[in-house]
UniProtKB/Swiss-Prot annotation:
This is Aryl hydrocarbon receptor nuclear translocator homolog. InterPro entries: bHLH_dom, Circadian_TF, HLH_DNA-bd_sf, Nuc_translocat, PAS, PAS-like_dom_sf, PAS_fold. Disruption phenotype: Abnormal cell morphology of developing RMEL/R neurons. Arrested development at larvae life stage due to its requirement in the pharynx. Defects in SDQR neuron cell dorsal-ventral migration. Aggregation behavior is diminished. Abolishes guanylate cyclase gene expression in the URX neurons. SUPFAM superfamilies: HLH, helix-loop-helix DNA-binding domain (SSF47459), PYP-like sensor domain (PAS domain) (SSF55785). The gene is aha-1. It comes from Caenorhabditis elegans. Pfam families: HLH, PAS, PAS_11. It is found in: Nucleus. Its main location: nucleus. Interacts with hif-1. Heterodimer; efficient DNA binding requires dimerization with another bHLH protein. Forms a heterodimer with ahr-1; binds DNA as heterodimer. Forms a heterodimer with PAS domain-containing protein cky-1; binds DNA as heterodimer. Residues 348-392 form the PAC domain. Residues 44-97 form the bHLH domain.
């Protein structure tokens, strides 16, 4: 009985194999099928994992590219940054935003100013206005009311009008390139002196991001109501219209779709500011009896207001490059020179002197200040304003107390009124007094040889 119950394992396996052979199936087929099924499962698992990883990498690349467009530091780069650089700049940008928001916003506004007064001050300082243009149609969708003090135009003059109608015809191609966002464009340079657009043959990649920055000439309204428009330089004219140089900075913003099948649209959001070179240099543009001079550290005049020719009869080309104190009466040269040295030592300057004209000397009040570079805190230049005394105050005029040394001046004899011969040019290029009895002569400008009689 016990022998019937006991079964040898080897005999059992042998009996099963014999049964499979009796049924016509080889003994190793099950093992091969199991191996093939295992290999297929591993292959399918690997392929599925690779597909999942590929999709994950594509999504990560897409989000990082969107992040690069949102971070200003990445958008300002001239090349496409790598992913690590994008993440690093994004973290830095977020830290900066968090640092700004942590501060109290009310600390930026003085307590004695209302919100409306602060708004007007900001608009006056910015000297610009905000506008929005549709990239597909070129129509102006929005313009701020601050356009009136800048261009002397109303909002209705811009709204729903094509931007090409509001800018100089020579700048229309440039604006079209900025709106379309093409990757390759021909370089176009605006010459501020001639007003023409120069084309360079080389092609370049102009738009690496959604940010935009360009200079164009915009139409202005009537020049008479606002003195700021009358003194704005340079002014361009075309077909009876006046144009002024504006610097536009902004970015391209994608608008949400209007429907399921609606085409994608975008718009340019930008701020237009007056070009710095277009603004008058003097502090009070309405004043007709003063002119400004910019003086370098060595005392030479590097810039002179164009109104100097109307006030003293000498053009700015004749004075630029000369020493500032050579413009004064010989008896006042030392006073002006000493005041200039004191001004460089952070001392205030306001003196009464006599300045040279083409035929005589006239009294004026000179006030000056020293301009320092706000970034490097280094000396840049001195800005001096010459206020010509009114005719009724000339008799009561008192110059700054000084005892001049009896010496000859570059312009003529001591204390004498200048004549036209005082402005002759020597072979060395300096101004010299001519011999007594020399024939009278006027300055004549020779582009090749300088000043000739």
């Amino acid at each position: 009985m016990a022998q019937d119950i006991f079964m040898d394992p080897w005999q059992s396996a042998t009996s099963f194999a014999m049964e499979d052979e009796d049924m016509g199936m080889p003994s190793g087929k099950y093992a091969r099928m199991e191996d093939e099924m295992g290999e297929n499962k591993e292959r399918f698992a690997r392929e599925n994992h690779s597909e999942i990883e590929r999709r994950r990498r594509n999504k990560m690349t897409h989000y990082i590219n969107e992040l690069a467009e949102m971070v200003p530091q990445c958008a300002s780069l001239g090349r496409k940054p790598d992913k690590l650089t994008i993440l690093r700049m994004a973290v830095s940008h977020m830290k900066g935003i968090r640092g700004h928001t942590a501060q109290d916003e009310t600390s930026y506004k003085p307590s004695f100013l209302t919100d409306q007064e602060l708004k007007h001050l900001i608009l006056e300082a910015a000297n610009g206005f905000l506008f929005v243009v549709c990239c597909q149609t070129g129509k102006v969708l929005y313009v701020a009311d601050s356009i009136t003090p800048v261009l002397n135009l109303k909002q209705e003059d811009w709204l729903q009008r094509n931007l090409n109608e509001l800018i100089h015809p020579d700048d229309q191609d440039k604006i079209r390139d900025q709106l379309c966002g093409s990757e390759v464009s021909v370089n176009k340079v605006l010459d501020l002196k001639s007003g023409s657009v120069k084309r360079e043959g080389a092609s370049t990649r102009v738009h690496m991001s959604c940010r935009r920055g360009f200079i164009c000439r915009m139409r202005v309204g009537a020049l008479e109501p606002l003195h700021r428009l009358r003194n704005r330089r340079p002014l361009f004219q075309h077909a009876g219209q006046n144009y002024v140089v504006m610097h536009c900075t902004g970015y391209i913003k994608n608008a949400p779709p209007q429907g399921i099948n609606a085409p994608a649209s975008s718009c340019l959001v930008a701020i237009a500011r007056l070009q710095v070179a277009s603004m008058p240099v003097c502090a009070d543009p309405t004043s007709t009896n003063q002119f400004s001079v910019r003086v370098s550290e060595d005392g030479k005049m590097t810039f002179i207001d164009a109104r100097v020719s109307d006030l003293i009869g000498l053009s700015s080309d004749q004075l630029i490059g000369r020493y500032w104190w050579n413009l004064a009466h010989p008896a006042d040269e030392k006073t002006l020179q000493d005041s200039f040295v004191a001004l460089l030592s952070d001392q205030p300057m306001r003196i009464n002197i006599r300045v040279r004209t083409s035929t005589d000397y006239i009294p004026c009040t000179v006030s000056a200040y020293k301009f320092m570079n706000p970034y490097s805190e280094q000396f840049e230049y001195v800005v001096a304003t010459h206020q010509i005394a009114p005719q009724e105050d000339i008799n009561n005029w008192v110059t700054a107390p000084t005892v001049p040394q009896p010496q000859a001046s570059e312009f003529g004899e001591l204390g004498g009124a200048p004549s036209a011969v005082d402005y002759g040019q020597s072979s060395s290029g300096g101004w010299r007094p001519e011999a007594q009895g020399a024939p009278q002569a006027q300055w004549q400008w020779d582009p090749m040889n300088g000043y000739n009689q």
